[in-house]
C-alpha cells in the first residue's frame, strides 16, 4: 500500500523535498508518494489542509515557511509536541500520536509535532567541517526557522549567540522564551539586536529568513564579518551568500540541511534510518 506524505508551505514550488523523500523510499524499499502542497498564508487554511490530509489517510507532513509556528500551535492543542519542538516553539514534522489513535481520538485530533531542523543544520555543518564547539554565532531572523535551530546549536557547544531580527521585539521575545525554558550558553545571556545593527566579527552567520527567495537583500552592516556564512534557503542564487563570499567567507546554502532534517523526519515516520552521506551523493549524481 502506498504511504502518502506532503510538504506544506508558501512558496513551495521550489521544494526539493519530493525528490529527496522519493529517494529515501526507494532505498528503504517502501512505496511512497510525497508531494508539495501550496497553502494560502493564514492559520485557518493551514489547519484545513492538514486536517484533510491526515483524515484522508496521510502518514506524515513536513512544514516549511511560513507555517512552522502555526503547526506548533496546532499540535500543542492536540496530539502533543517533542521536547525540541516545545523549546523551539516551531514544528517542521507532523505525524500522528499512535497512543491517542489507539484510545479512539480522531486522526485530526492526534497531530504530533517535532522539529528536526536544528539537528539537520548541525549535522550538515559538521559534515562540512565547520567548527561549532566554541564558535561565536549570529542568527538573522527570529521566526520558526530560527527557533528550530537555536537549541541544537547550543547543544553542539557554541560559545556565544546573537539573534538579529528586523523587528527587535520579536528577537527579544524568542530569547525570553528560551530563558523561560532554561536554555543558556555557559550561563551567558543570548544577545539580540536589529538586523541593520548587527556588526562585528563572528565565526558563523546563519540567515534564517526567506528574504533571499525573492531576490531581496538584507540590510547588512559594512562592519559585519564572518568566516562561514550559511543560508537556510536553497535552490537559487542567494544574495546573502554572495555578499559574504565576496568578503572571503566559506558559504553554503541549506540543501544539505534539508537532506539532514528530511532523513530525521523519514525515520520518525517509517522507522527506517537513512545514510545521509550516501543519500546526498546519490542526489547530487541524479542532478548532474
Swiss-Prot record:
GO biological process terms held by the UniProt record: amino acid biosynthetic process; aromatic amino acid family biosynthetic process; chorismate biosynthetic process; shikimate metabolic process
Ligand binding (shikimate): 15-17, 64, 92, 117, 234
Gene: aroE
Pathway(s) per entry: Metabolic intermediate biosynthesis; chorismate biosynthesis; chorismate from D-erythrose 4-phosphate and phosphoenolpyruvate: step 4/7
Function according to Swiss-Prot or TrEMBL: Involved in the biosynthesis of the chorismate, which leads to the biosynthesis of aromatic amino acids. Catalyzes the reversible NADPH linked reduction of 3-dehydroshikimate (DHSA) to yield shikimate (SA).
Coiled-coil segments: none
Catalytic activity: shikimate + NADP(+) = 3-dehydroshikimate + NADPH + H(+)
GO molecular function: NADP binding; shikimate 3-dehydrogenase (NADP+) activity
Self-association state and partner proteins as the record states: Homodimer.
Protein name: Shikimate dehydrogenase (NADP(+))
SUPFAM superfamilies linked to this entry: Aminoacid dehydrogenase-like, N-terminal domain, NAD(P)-binding Rossmann-fold domains
EC number, UniProt record: 1.1.1.25
Enzyme type, top EC level: oxidoreductase
Amino acid at each position: 500500500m502506498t504511504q502518502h506524505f506532503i510538504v506544506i508551505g508558501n512558496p513551495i514550488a521550489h521544494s526539493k523535498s519530493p525528490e529527496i523523500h522519493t529517494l529515501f523510499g526507494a532505498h528503504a524499499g517502501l512505496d511512497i508518494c510525497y508531494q508539495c502542497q501550496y497553502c494560502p498564508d493564514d492559520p485557518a487554511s493551514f489547519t484545513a489542509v492538514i486536517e484533510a490530509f491526515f483524515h484522508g489517510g496521510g502518514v506524515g507532513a513536513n512544514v516549511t515557511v511560513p507555517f512552522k509556528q502555526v503547526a506548533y500551535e496546532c499540535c500543542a492543542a492536540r496530539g502533543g509536541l517533542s521536547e525540541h519542538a516545545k523549546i523551539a516553539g516551531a514544528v517542521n514534522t507532523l505525524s500522528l500520536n499512535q497512543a491517542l489513535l489507539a484510545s479512539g481520538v480522531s486522526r485530526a485530533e492526534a497531530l504530533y509535532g517535532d522539529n528536526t531542523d536544528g539537528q539537520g543544520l548541525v549535522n550538515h555543518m559538521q559534515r562540512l567541517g565547520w567548527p561549532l564547539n566554541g564558535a561565536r554565532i549570529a542568527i538573522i531572523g527570529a521566526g520558526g526557522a530560527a527557533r528550530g535551530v537555536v537549541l541544537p546549536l547550543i547543544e553542539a557547544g557554541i560559545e556565544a549567540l546573537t539573534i538579529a531580527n528586523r523587528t527587535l521585539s520579536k528577537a527579544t521575545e524568542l530569547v525570553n522564551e528560551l530563558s523561560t525554558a532554561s536554555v543558556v550558553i555557559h550561563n551567558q545571556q543570548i544577545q539580540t539586536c536589529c538586523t541593520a545593527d548587527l556588526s562585528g566579527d563572528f565565526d558563523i552567520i546563519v540567515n534564517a529568513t526567506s528574504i533571499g527567495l525573492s531576490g531581496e537583500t538584507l540590510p547588512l552592516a559594512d562592519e559585519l564579518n564572518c568566516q562561514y556564512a550559511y543560508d537556510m534557503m536553497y535552490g537559487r542564487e542567494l544574495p546573502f551568500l554572495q555578499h559574504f563570499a565576496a568578503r572571503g567567507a566559506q558559504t553554503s546554502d541549506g540543501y544539505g540541511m534539508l537532506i539532514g532534517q528530511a532523513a530525521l523526519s523519514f525515520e520518525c515516520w517509517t522507522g527506517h534510518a537513512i545514510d545521509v552521506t550516501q543519500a546526498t551523493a546519490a542526489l547530487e549524481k541524479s542532478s548532474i
